[in-house]
Amino acid sequence: MAEKQTAKRNRREEILQSLALMLESSDGSQRITTAKLAASVGVSEAALYRHFPSKTRMFDSLIEFIEDSLITRINLILKDEKDTSARLRLIVLLILGFGERNPGLTRILTGHALMFEQDRLQGRINQLFERIEAQLRQVLREKRMREGEGYATDENLLASQLLAFCEGMLSRFVRSEFKYRPTDDFDARWPLIAAQLQ
């Protein structure tokens, strides 16, 4: 019984990895059908549906992976790092680095891969970005408690500016067909971003 569960989990992972790879390829710039995905995995469409009730559920699973990866790592940064500027830098670099290492998933983060899918999937991505923005806002607000002084600029504005930078770099990555990596020149860009944190 345990072997059967492991085999089923492995097949599910194989399907999700194939979907992510298709999103990374030129196929990702078009609607991905279950027929194309089944051919990529080397199974029938019926076999796909034995593991996932719908393509939407496949995207749900990829979004869960994105959420778990980013939120878990953000929480680790907040636990390990106490300096506000370092926290913000690490969170921004985490988001950009995750996108760079996972180009297919970046198409999901930017909404590009979800254009032809159910609206609620885009809603989940919107919620993820709202959670990240709330985390950034909290880090900015905690500066006053941790370091004795806050920012002159409203923390809401600063948090949205940081997130807009991340979203812009991820969109540029997708638009360029993954030519312009989000972390390129980050060490030169960060001082420009940090200068806005007044």
UniProtKB/Swiss-Prot annotation:
Transmembrane segments: none annotated. Residues 33-52 bind DNA. Residues 10-70 form the HTH tetR-type domain. It comes from the Bacteria. Homodimer. Interacts with FtsZ. PANTHER family: HTH-TYPE TRANSCRIPTIONAL REGULATOR RUTR, NUCLEOID OCCLUSION FACTOR SLMA. Residues 117-144 form a coiled coil. It holds the Pfam family TetR_N. GO terms for molecular function: DNA-binding transcription factor activity; transcription cis-regulatory region binding. InterPro entries: DNA-bd_HTH_TetR-type_CS (IPR023772), Homeodomain-like_sf (IPR009057), HTH-type_TetR-like_transc_reg (IPR050109), HTH_TetR (IPR001647), NO_SlmA (IPR023769), SlmA-like_C (IPR054580), Tet_transcr_reg_TetR-rel_C_sf (IPR036271). Keywords: Cell cycle, Cell division, Coiled coil, Cytoplasm, DNA-binding. This is Nucleoid occlusion factor SlmA.
